[in-house]
Amino acid sequence: MKPGSDPWAVLISLAHCLRLEVTSPNESTVQKDSADGLAPMSLQRVEESLTRHGYAFVEDEEHPDILRARFDDYRFQFMLTGEERGVLQTRGRWNHTVDVSRKVEIIKLCNEWNMNRIWPKVYVRRESEGLLGVYGELAADFRVGALDTQVDNAIACGLSTVIAFFRSLEERLGDELDDLDA
């Protein structure tokens, strides 16, 4: 498997999401945070995480509970959902639109991804009379609070896995990408 291929990207993103570390016997990894450090989720904590990683983002003027950013030319939103606003949702939109005549084909590609992977959830949504958007999202439940590292990992996992899906979609469609957005 060569770097850059879809399975490789998914494997790398999974390792990144899970923060896999290899240690020798009788050796432990250093834990910077402890369970005592759980703090309630807030949009400010999401902003702090994005800032810590040097990611540029903007606050949505129309929706003050949403942060927006671009990664690899894909649009992303970060928001807190749920009754207690404790579920962090990272949602990305593919940078192409699809004619409604290709709906079944694109839904099949999304369903194939969803059947073979735990995350992110991917789907197709009608955006106008004749155009569809393709989305990927990952939700992390932090209703009991979270460590900074958990927030950081949830954002990194959401970004890397959604982008892996978009790249997989582009690879599958190949030359047909030129026909989109027309």
Regions found by a protein language model. Give the residues of each.
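Charge-rich, low-complexity N-terminal segments
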Residues: K2-T81
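Short, ordered beta-strand-loop transition motifs
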Residues: V58-H63, G82-E84, R125-L132
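Long, continuous compositionally biased terminal/linker segments
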Residues: F71-I107
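Short, internal acidic amphipathic alpha-helical interface segments
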Residues: G92-E137
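A short acidic/glycine-rich loop-to-helix N-cap element
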Residues: F142-I155
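Glycine-rich, aromatic-bearing surface loops/beta-hairpins
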Residues: C157-A164
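Short, highly charged C-terminal tails/helix-capping segments
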Residues: E170-A182
